Amino acid sequence: MASARAASRGVYRYLCPNCGGPNSEERLSRGLPCPRCLPRLPRKGVSGWTGLARLLRREGTLGAGVKAMASLEEEARSLWRFFEKAVGSPPWGAQRTWAKRLARGDSFSIIAPTGVGKTTFGAAASLFYACKKGMRSYIVLPTTTLAANVARKLESMVESTGCGRVRLLVIHSKLKTSERREAMERFEKGDFDILVTTAAFARKYADRLSGYRFRLVFVDDVDAVLRSARSVDAILKIVGFDEEAIEKGLEVLRLQREQARLVGLLQSQREEVREEARKKLLEVKRRLERLEAEIEARRGRTASLIVSSATGRPRGARVRLFRVLLNFEAGGRGDIGLRRVIDSYTHPTDGVAEKVVELVRRLGTGGLVYVPIDMGVEYAERLAEELRRAGVKAEAYHAKKPLELLDRFAEGEIDVLVGVANYYGTLVRGLDLPARVRYAVFAGVPRHKFGSDIGDPHPSRLLRLLSILAESRIEEVASAARSHMGRLRRMLRVLSPAALQMIAERVARGEVEGGYDRQVLEAYQFLREALARDDVWESLRELDVGIVREGGRTYILVPDPATYLQASGRTSRLYAGGITLGLSVVVVDNEPVMRGLMKRVSWMAEVDWRRFEDLDLQSILREIDEDREKVRRVVKGLYRGVELVRTALLVVESPNKARTIARFFGQPSVRLLPGGGRVYEVATGDKILMIMASGGHVFDLVVRVDGRDLEAAGGEPEHAIFGVLRYRLGGNGAAAYTPVYTSIKRCLDCGYQFVDEASRCPRCGSELIRNSLSTVEDLRRVAWEADEVYVGTDPDTEGEKIGWDVALALRPYAPDIKRLEFHEVTKKAILEALSNPRSFDDNLVDAQVVRRVEDRWIGFTLSPLLWCDFWPRYCKRVLEEYGEKRPHMDRERCAKYKAYYNLSAGRVQTPTLGWVVDRTLAYRKKVWLYRVVHDSQLLFAVRSDDPEVPESVKRVLDNWVKHHKKTGIEPWLDVKAVVEKEEWTALPPPPPYTTDTMLRDANRLLGLGSAEAMRIAQDLFEWGLITYHRTDSTRVSDRGMQVAREWLETRFGGLAGQLYRPRRWGEGGAHEAIRPVRPIDVERLQLLVEEGVIELPGTLTRRHLRLYDLIFRRFMASQMREADALRVVYRLRVPELDGYTLTLERVVEIGRPGDAEGVTRGFTLVWPYVRPQPRLVEGREAWIRARVEGRQVPKAYPYTEGEIVEEMKTRGIGRPSTYAKIVETLFRRRYVIEVSREEGRGAGFVVATSRGINVYNYLTEELRSADEEEYGGRIAGILRRVPSLVSEDRTRELERQMDMVEKGDASRDDVLESVFNEISDLALLLNIEHPIKHRSRAEGNTQGNTWVSNFVACAVKSPEVSRVWGAGVG
């Protein structure tokens, strides 16, 4: 419900794309410059950057920003037009993106599916630079055949474009002797414009090639380039870096490691360590800046390098030189993270081989058959022979076979290839034939085979066996296995395959040369010793592994899910426009191993296993063949005019989330941007996705509005209040508000965040500042490259506003921007969100604007009162009451500071502080508590202040306790207990967590503070382990129910059907309860991380695991059946207490007698926090002896952090996103502290400090009776209204109004006007606010007031206020 207004709804500094000045929200949303650059809005849309440049040139205001973009756009469009002429069709989205990067002179790694035209683009771009720019290019290919093919393609392009003068030189091994001699002569003379060779030639002649200056080097065999340090140096030299530049790059790598170490030391507890780290960090930063500037200057004179994606994971310092010198890291295959496979299994009635033959004959050509690795090449050969005898054209393929077999298979001359299911084998990893491979058959479950002697001590092999022993019920074995796993996993992350193989060979020979060797040897010896124990073998039989006897020896068969996913993935490949459908069939030869495979695969991917016999095979094969036909048409270029692949930028908030999403789709390529940002690039089929992080908020309200801001806002504002302009609308009293935003700066030294336009930290003076403007520039850079932009910030009002700010910043560079909403970070959720983007929700944005502006206004209005009026009063009280000797937390501060600026007040903060104060004061008051105890069990308790208990009862108890103190004789009572009712009842499970209940239990059960719990939950969400954690919904989605069912089936087997009770809990809305996203419990999660199956972008600590376990158990409990509980109701009568009678209810049993399987225990099987109590008496009634205990106790106990959050939810103030922040602020301001419980167990109590009590009393009581003589009559009258500003009722009402804005039932300007009316008099009279049109009103009301003069003189010394206060607008 936007108000009609003459001015902008918002102003953003630095976002004019032309001059870099402030720009309005409305102009940004249209992609236009600020009013100074473009005074008159164009009637029609502006066509691109070149059209905008022409428009600004006519105005005489063309600036550097638009001029540079127009030049880049024209360069890219020239390449697009040339490409269309050369190829016969316009470039697709990916090719347009690559052209834009080339126009900028960037180097990058290509991640793209089959059929997108990588090589075609490389050839066309090379010809463009040769023909139109007179610049050389070099194309490097993996094979002679491809080199010859590209040469033919270039010759055709030359003819199409009329570039007959371009000199093309092709050198490969199939040239005749005379042709090669002539080619080499031309090469030596430099008689070429485009050079095409293999990678081997590039390595051999790198020094000679470095003498030619290339504009483009296109490498279609990056694996060959990354194979060795020599290969890396060769390509860097060819691109244009000499030995000196390479050495500088290596020095940068060393300094970056040192910088990371020093940043870690800034967190030290010792000041001298931090100070030394600061000095060294500045020195390292300066050296890095110098070296990076020198490299940047050199980079401007080098070729653009384009490389294809890598199949492996390259490691080593030389590989990292690409990042330093060329700003990118080569990614892996962009399609291994995606699969579209029908996963099935079948049990053979005869033999495995016979079943394989039957399947292949039914499924036809285009098949891959995999035999288990323990069966070996010999079995693959025998199986291929059996297939041939059955009339199938089959061949076994392995390392000793010629590569031409793969070519014959690709051409259709061979129907089926048979190979070994080896993770590193060609048929498992290196085959990418989307038009040819239709299905895969596994002749036995993929597995590893281990004997008791272990065999080869390769670390990866040992890790697999350790992962099985880690599941052993023998705790000492499982614990030791997990310990060895952690060490080996760290080793596998940092060492190359060659280094790992060398370690294995040394250990096998009994040679130990270093720490890594020793770790492998220790793991090897542990495994041998463990497998020599009979009890270990017995425990293994309980797991989903195979135990077989062969030749008098026992072996373990361990399922190999990674190989299964890789091998079956050969049937489902990315191509330009989608992912091919594939079929996988496992012929089961060992049932336990198959169960283990199915279970382990589900931890790595979303797989729906089906019986092969239940498949609609005809329909599946028809779809498989239709997909292959699409691929063939794409490769032949028959989809001209149809854009099958587009590029998209996805912006999320955190780098962790960006990395997590990228890894769903394989090993991403990474580009480093000038502002320090990273962009991860992956392929999803119809999109090439570039993923970046905004780092959270990129803009916040300015502290002081200036003239340029007013110019951008337009209209005639009446006031500027703490970064917000107020406009009067007509004569009806309505108003409109324009927030003014600027970039956020963060000190890398002390962590302080500020918005001042300063190059030094206002708090500590450090020059180590990170400005969010650099993030904006990086985002704009990538947004210009993309066809479309998606903003995937968090799914709440704060995330909507962050996303809206980002969208406005990017709009001039990206016309197509949409919002993505996802509540869990999983591959499925991301793909669904990409398929269903939405527009931004203006109501959510407006609601967050209201929250931020209201928070700023209240804080900036009230906080100065605390700094400059409250503090001296408080200090006077402290010094008078405590003197010089009695300790007090603020005595030294009072002596040191006349004003104290680490104080604040807020609308939600103050009532919350009030609850803590009330409980703290009540805690100091004492009442008598009488406990009547039988056999250490509390029967009942009586408090002396309980109005429900008769006074006569209290008097008797009091007398007995006093008598005991005098005589030392313990008072005893006779209590008659009668069972009134005894019945079995259903005990319902708790609902899944919302934010408040999670914080309560994290505090109560784990001892975590609310801020820490939220930080841990944020990690778990961003790592893709739980759903969004800022929610007040208990709703469970269908997917959530499926997660519960799958885990219960794994955990309880056949009992799962009796235990599973799916519940929705809440209805409607997009939000969901907090739950795990996969059926993985905490023990399994820990193992999968240690195995490397799950890779997280951060360190999984014990606290992460404990909170995850709590969330996991609570959710599983919510989806389980009720517990059968035996409830007993007792009536207790105490004759000696005037016949006092009361009722006592207890749950004495959970789970019915005779239920050995525990089904009737229901949800308590996983939720251990519900326990039965002992029976009070046996039989129906009995007299029992009870002891009376009496002691003084607090009238009320203080809150715990969890209870404070629960109270905020119950009383309706605060929101899921602010609960923890409010509590954290109270601690940071030292208004509250945490104290241990008397019994020393459980979450600590939160008590108000002297400072907190006095702050609360000042705001709510003292100002209510402000003295007119001290403050002046007018000001005193206004100060008396302050208590109402921070009252709980007013806060709750404002929360209600903000909820109405969120739903679209109220206008943001109307709500802000109501807040302004509350604070305006105070702001004007104290000269805080900048009156624009009516300055005399403020001056007139405060002239001659001594209190105001002193107050302002004090307040302007605050770093926050000195740039806000003062007359007029700066």
Curated annotation (Swiss-Prot):
Descriptive protein name: Reverse gyrase 1
Catalytic activity entry: ATP + H2O = ADP + phosphate + H(+)
PROSITE patterns to which the protein is assigned, alphabetical: HELICASE_ATP_BIND_1, TOPO_IA_2, TOPRIM, ZF_RG_C, ZF_RG_N
GO biological process terms, semicolon-separated: DNA topological change
UniProt-listed Enzyme Commission number(s): 5.6.2.-
UniProt-annotated stretches for the region Topoisomerase I: 643-1370
Compartmental location: Cytoplasm
Helicase ATP-binding domain segment(s): 99-287
Residue ranges constituting the Toprim domain according to the UniProt record: 647-825
Stretches annotated zinc finger (RG C-terminal-type): 744-772
Function: Modifies the topological state of DNA by introducing positive supercoils in an ATP-dependent process, increasing the linking number in steps of +1. Binds to single-stranded DNA, transiently cleaves and then rejoins the ends, introducing a positive supercoil in the process. The scissile phosphodiester is attacked by the catalytic tyrosine of the enzyme, resulting in the formation of a DNA-(5'-phosphotyrosyl)-enzyme intermediate. Probably involved in rewinding DNA strands in regions of the chromosome that have opened up to allow replication, transcription, DNA repair and/or for DNA protection.
Family: In the N-terminal section; belongs to the DEAD box helicase family. DDVD subfamily. In the C-terminal section; belongs to the type IA topoisomerase family.
Other facts: This enzyme is the only unique feature of hyperthermophilic bacteria/archaea known and seems to be essential for adaptation to life at high temperatures. It may play a role in stabilization of DNA at high temperatures.
Subunit structure: Monomer.
Binding site for Zn(2+) 1: 16, 19, 34, 37
Domain comment, as recorded: Introduction of positive supercoils requires the cooperation of both domains. The helicase-like domain probably does not directly unwind DNA, but more likely acts by driving ATP-dependent conformational changes within the whole enzyme. A beta hairpin in the 'latch' region of the N-terminal domain plays a regulatory role in the enzyme, repressing topoisomerase activity in the absence of ATP and preventing the enzyme from acting as an ATP-independent relaxing enzyme; it also helps to coordinate nucleotide hydrolysis by the ATPase domain with the supercoiling activity of the topoisomerase domain.
InterPro entries, A to Z: AAA+_ATPase (IPR003593), DEAD/DEAH_box_helicase_dom (IPR011545), Helicase_ATP-bd (IPR014001), Helicase_C-like (IPR001650), P-loop_NTPase (IPR027417), Reverse_gyrase (IPR005736), Topo_IA_2 (IPR003601), Topo_IA_cen (IPR013497)
